[in-house]
């Protein structure tokens, strides 16, 4: 009974004497769990097996909105699609009845219109150094792939635009085919059965990819650092990844907001469940609360990697810029001259502005 009393008094802060609090000794994985202390530990001692898990927050500086930010988030800006509720745009039942709003949004967010951020390239740098075990992402924007990160290192928990399937016969279509259909403002229809072709994005009511369930056991077995960036940790089962590493694995949060601090009442072992970076019983959690790009740049500087990271960003973006320019030129050759009688008012405004 004393053990139970001490647990609730010290871990859950639900009462108990000050003497009981003193009885619990917190053994930290590293002596200093501040961001600077963590960075110094990494610089001196290093890590061997790093897992990253990210959300929309690492892509916002690329111009892609996150989902839940009031006013600027994706769900706050869907009124023009006249949806029954904001999340309907990713609802499978609604999509089957009315796919047009999703494809209108897809045109705005389609991969190829954006370039990876410093946070994306930091993950690529981890892989280049042989430190990255696996990269788990909630994002559907494929920016991870654009950095040159190997496909086998990436688990797109919520799918992506990279592959596409007919929702009726399951015939597969590649990304280039889907892009051509979307940007021609055509509803993507299967050439075999005329069913609607949907990107392999996980909608509400669909299962996550098999690799999401089969990989964590191996990935987290000897993981000594979990880096969490740009995610609200509100969507399950993705958020449950923070529970997977053992108690000696350090968990680093780089995020605008403090997240992952679920009520300990829900979990009998809060040291493996909630992030405790601001709690007195914290043993292994570290936080950088701010912009994701600023966080990785600060970390790279502390590790002496800042020049290397900047060189990687510059060289890879130059490659992407050349590739995109080439694609635009090719599209320009194939695109007929605009018919003034068929131009929208927006097209005319753009043309007038260029004169």
Swiss-Prot record:
Record carries keyword Metal-binding: yes
Catalytic center residues: 158 (proton acceptor)
An individual GO BP term: response to starvation
Annotated positions binding NAD(+): 55-75, 138-141, 230-232, 255-257, 292
EC number of the protein: 2.3.1.286
Entries under PROSITE patterns matching the protein: SIRTUIN (PS50305)
Cofactor note: Binds 1 zinc ion per subunit.
Keyword Zinc listed: yes
Coiled-coil region list: none
Null mutant phenotype: Causes lethality during development. Induced silencing shortens life span.
Pfam families, A to Z: SIR2 (PF02146)
Classification via CDD domains: SIRT1 (cd01408)
Gene Ontology CC: cytoplasm; mitochondrion; nucleus
Alphabetical UniProt keywords: Metal-binding, NAD, Transferase, Zinc
Residues that coordinate or bind Zn(2+): 166, 169, 190, 193
Cofactor(s) required, per the database record: Zn(2+)
Reaction(s) the record says it catalyses: N(6)-acetyl-L-lysyl-[protein] + NAD(+) + H2O = 2''-O-acetyl-ADP-D-ribose + nicotinamide + L-lysyl-[protein]
Top-level EC class: transferase
Family in the record: Belongs to the sirtuin family. Class I subfamily.
Its job: NAD-dependent protein deacetylase. May be involved in the regulation of life span.
Protein name: NAD-dependent protein deacetylase Sirt2
Source species: Drosophila melanogaster
Taxonomic lineage: Eukaryota, Metazoa, Ecdysozoa, Arthropoda, Hexapoda
């Amino acid at each position: 009974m004393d053990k139970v009393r001490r647990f609730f008094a010290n871990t859950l802060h639900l009462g108990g004497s000050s003497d009981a609090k003193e009885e619990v000794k917190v053994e930290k994985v590293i002596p200093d769990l501040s961001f600077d202390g963590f960075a110094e530990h990494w610089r001196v001692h290093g890590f061997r097996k790093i897992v990253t898990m990210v959300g929309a927050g690492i892509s916002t500086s690329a111009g892609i909105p996150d989902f839940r930010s009031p006013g600027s988030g994706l769900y706050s800006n869907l009124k023009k699609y006249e949806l029954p509720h904001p999340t309907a745009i990713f609802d499978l039942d609604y999509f089957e009845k009315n796919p047009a709003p999703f494809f209108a949004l897809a045109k705005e967010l389609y991969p190829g219109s954006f370039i990876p951020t410093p946070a994306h390239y930091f993950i690529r740098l981890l892989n280049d150094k042989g430190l990255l075990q696996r990269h788990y992402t909630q994002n559907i924007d494929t920016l991870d792939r654009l950095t040159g990160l190997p496909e086998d290192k990436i688990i797109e928990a919520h799918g992506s635009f990279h592959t596409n399937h007919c929702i009726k016969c399951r015939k597969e279509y590649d990304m280039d085919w889907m892009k051509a259909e979307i940007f021609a403002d055509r509803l993507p229809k299967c050439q075999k059965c005329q069913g609607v072709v949907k990107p392999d994005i996980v909608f509400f009511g669909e299962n996550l990819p098999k690799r999401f369930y089969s990989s964590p056991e191996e990935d987290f077995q000897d993981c000594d650092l979990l880096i969490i960036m740009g995610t609200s940790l509100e969507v399950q089962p993705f958020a449950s990844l923070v529970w997977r590493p053992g108690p000696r694995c350090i968990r680093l949060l780089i995020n605008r907001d403090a997240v992952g601090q679920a009520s300990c009442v829900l979990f009998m072992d809060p040291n493996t469940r909630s992030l405790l970076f601001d709690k007195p019983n914290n043993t292994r959690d570290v936080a950088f609360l701010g912009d994701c790009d600023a966080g990785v740049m600060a970390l790279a500087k502390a590790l002496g990697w800042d020049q290397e990271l900047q060189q990687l960003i510059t060289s890879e973006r130059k490659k992407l810029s050349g590739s995109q320019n080439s694609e635009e030129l090719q599209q320009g050759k194939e695109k007929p001259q605009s018919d003034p009688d068929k131009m929208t008012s927006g097209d005319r405004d753009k043309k007038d502005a260029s004169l």
